[in-house]
Amino acid sequence: MPAFGECQKIINPQGLPLEALSQSERIFLEFCELYDSYPEEIKEAIKQW
């Protein structure tokens, strides 16, 4: 999974405020930000999905 900074560059290269992004873009950024805090079981399920 890319780090949050990399996700930010992919999803929001112009550096727009979060309010300007779509809901799915905001959810993906939140997912990237929180990914490292997920238990290993969830990370494995995500990799297999």
From Swiss-Prot:
It comes from the Viruses. This is Uncharacterized protein 12. It comes from Sulfolobus islandicus filamentous virus (isolate Iceland/Hveragerdi). The lineage of its organism: Viruses, Adnaviria, Zilligvirae, Taleaviricota, Tokiviricetes. The gene is SIFV0012.
